[in-house]
Amino acid sequence: PEPDEAPRMVRVFQAAALALGGGSVDEEVRGGGAVPAARQLVLAFAGCCALLSGPRRYRAPTGAKPLAWHLAEAMGKEAAPDLLRVLNAMLILSADHELSPPTFSARIAASVGAELHACVGAALAALSGTGLAGGCDRIEDTLAAVRSRGQLDAWVARVVRDRARSSAFGIESYPQGDPRAALLIRMAREHPRPGLRAGTLLRFVDEVQARVGVPPRIELGLVAACAAWDLPPGAASALWAMGRTAGWIAHTLEQRLNGFFLRPRGQFHAGPQGGAVLKSQAT
């Protein structure tokens, strides 16, 4: 990225995971097993978050501190209790969410004997899509471009015109609203001095909901909480990926215990123009 541009942290984490790995499950076991490898991954990702602020270089976590504390330090923030509370909330709320595409990717890799770093790397590759953590980056990019009431109105009008069909609003799993997003947005509203970025985003959420009635997704909740605590751009997708990583590690270990391959099956069917269409079904 340019010097003043935030890196896409999911891609940074993916590169870090693959650089730290590269061995086999046997080598992982000889190195002490999955727990040391998991700790190495999570702490490395925390150190990578220093790329979001200050001199934009890796900062190795030091001392026996909670993960949220390491993250605050990496992003150039004082580890105040209120910040640690919201960081922990974002990590916990992001940790697991059914069998999402990234989680399924991690489990498929684990089922065929990939080592831990490779399983997490596979999941991160899926998470980087704009329909998932990439959605946080898109919201932050749009928010950064909103510098007037007219630009905010145009953003609201665009979303309303599309009936809020975006990665920011509406999720089939929660027809009454995503409770993860609701909690994070409430925390953002409760901040005594949320700042301009958060205020603009919260007005955007309120106006879209008033016109369309579609509740926000976790992406908006993460960006709102990060903006309220003045975390640097890119922090929302980074925190989502870090929370998810803990879940993927657990899924990887569980899948290994199952002892069978996850192999989706495919059937070819005649297409409308005479070609073949592959329809897949997980088994």
Please provide the spans of the model-predicted regions.
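Hydrophobic alpha-helical bundle cores within soluble ligand-binding/oligomerization subdomains
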Residues: 1-283
